[in-house]
């Protein structure tokens, strides 16, 4: 389970150190990285990534939008080995798409981690905090209530 925030910097070789508290969730020293829906990078343990990949594969290839979605998702995905110092090397195209050049904010999202350019995340967080009450009210209306 991934929770909380932390900020790390890319080193001179473009590597980033995973937060200590999260390293154990990545079995076999493997992490899967892909582009997120909001201009960020998402990191998944192998089991969570495989579940998501299976959902994508269930989409019919007879639909052009499904093919394009699968094409983007799988072409932007990378299997990355975690080195002995807990670092990963993200691809330059993935870093460029997310606008990450130095400071990286790690955001725990329960099943995965989002990576954001820190300045971009700070702007997003400020807006989200301002709208938190409205966001929660609208989202929680969709959740069935236990009685």
Residue ranges: model-predicted function:
Residues 1-8, 12-13, 22-80, 84, ...:
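Flexible "stalk/tail and boundary" regions
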């Amino acid at each position: 389970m991934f929770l909380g925030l932390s900020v790390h910097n890319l080193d001179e070789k473009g590597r980033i150190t995973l937060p200590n508290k999260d390293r154990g969730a990545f079995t076999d020293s493997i992490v899967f990285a892909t582009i997120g829906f909001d201009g960020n990078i998402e990191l998944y343990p192998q089991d969570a990534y495989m579940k998501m990949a299976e959902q994508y594969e269930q989409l019919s290839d007879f639909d052009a939008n499904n093919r394009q979605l699968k094409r983007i998702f799988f072409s932007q995905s990378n299997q990355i080995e975690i080195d002995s110092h807990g670092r990963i090397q993200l691809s330059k195209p993935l870093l460029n798409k997310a606008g990450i050049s130095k400071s990286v904010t790690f955001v725990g999202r329960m099943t995965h981690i989002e990576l954001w350019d820190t300045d971009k995340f700070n702007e997003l967080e400020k807006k989200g905090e301002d709208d938190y009450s409205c966001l929660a009210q609208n989202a929680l209306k969709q959740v069935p209530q236990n009685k």
